[in-house]
Amino acid sequence: MTENAHSTHSRAPRVLVVGDIGQHTYHVGDEAMTIASAQALAEGGAEVTLMTRDERHSARYLNASRGAEGDGYSYLPFFLFPWAPAERELTLAALECVLTELHADRERPSIAELVALPQVQALPEVLHPLEQTVERMVGFADSIAAMDAVVISGGGNLNSRFGWLLYERASVALVAEYAGVPLFVTGQSLARSSTPRMRRFWSACSAPPVR
């Protein structure tokens, strides 16, 4: 891996791999593509973290929970989005406002200050209490910012009308963009339409192959 602001030669590079794993309805193709990426990176010397909907579920299926010696994978939960399309947009807009404040050239804001942002106040009822949602946003952002690279595993997730798949990945790309973490995407199926959201997503990618 090339040197960047997040990497150092004194330790293994930390790579976050994002795939559709941890679903209680097992998706064999998505799981296989994600693990293929993770294994290739681990064999190359990377310290791999898998983003999942359920850490215990993934560790059980993959038989690769992180051990005391540092082997295996670490896990990071997805930031979950509401079902309604308008509410998903409100949530992503609030996340971007939080990121803007976190990366501003001034003292780091408190949770209370972030909760007071108009875009956060506009979040739907399903994401209340707002303090807990903002804490999850900040923890999510800090975890991704600590990575040296992010890899979004291939499949049809960016071509999906299931809102959680696209918006979960858009949120990862947004955090990586603000934190300056290189973002790579393995082969993806793409929709015919090109929305502003997807154009923003692809502009953040360092290497966007398609299938």
Where are these regions (language model features)?
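Short intrinsically disordered, low-complexity coil segments enriched in acidic
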Residues: 1-2, 211
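Aromatic- and Gly/Pro-rich donor/ligand-binding loops
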Residues: 3-194
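A conserved, positively charged/aromatic
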Residues: 199-210
